[in-house]
């Protein structure tokens, strides 16, 4: 049984959203079962399209040869990373109706905790 990894993303900033994807893709590439749970402004990472793609930091990161958010999102999908937008977080931030990327679930914290089980949780 592989060790599960849960990534709880509460920040809507580019740096934390980007690194949540770096951690998720890296862990999934190593065979770990990964779930990203985005809440509050962190839900913006899972929007379709994500406004983080237009953040000036995105171009700077890519210009330095680092994979950007679009590449990492695609990698996470390909690697089977589960993506959940927090229902309460969407409501709290006035984001109900935000178009989410295909395959993104809307669920609550209990669903996230159940998915991670006895695994690790990283909060960004």
Protein language model annotation of sequence segments:
Residues 18, 46-49, 96:
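Short, well-ordered secondary-structure micro-motifs
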Residues 34-40, 83-87:
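Short internal beta-strands
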Residues 84-124:
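N-terminal glycine-rich phosphate/adenylate-binding segment common to multiple enzyme folds
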Residues 23-27, 75, 112:
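Hydrophobic/aromatic ligand-binding patch that stacks against planar heteroaromatic rings
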Residues 54-84:
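A glycine-rich helix N-cap at a beta->alpha junction
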Residues 42-55:
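N-terminal beta-loop-helix "entrance" segment that forms/cooperates
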Residues 5-18:
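Short, glycine-rich nucleotide/cofactor-binding loops
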Residues 18-30, 36:
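Histidine-anchored nucleotide/phosphate-binding helix
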């Amino acid at each position: 049984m592989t060790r599960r990894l849960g990534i709880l993303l509460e920040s809507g900033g580019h740096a934390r959203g980007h690194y949540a994807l770096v951690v998720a893709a890296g862990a999934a590439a190593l065979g770990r079962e990964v779930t990203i749970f985005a809440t509050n402004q962190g839900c913006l990472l899972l929007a379709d399209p994500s406004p983080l793609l237009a953040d000036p930091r995105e171009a700077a990161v890519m210009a330095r040869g680092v994979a950007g958010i679009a590449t990492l999102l695609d990698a996470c999908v390909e690697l089977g990373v589960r993506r959940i937008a927090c229902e309460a977080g969407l409501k709290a931030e006035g984001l109900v109706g935000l178009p989410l990327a295909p395959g993104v679930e809307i669920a609550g914290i209990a669903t996230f905790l159940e998915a991670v089980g006895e695994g690790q949780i990283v909060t960004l």
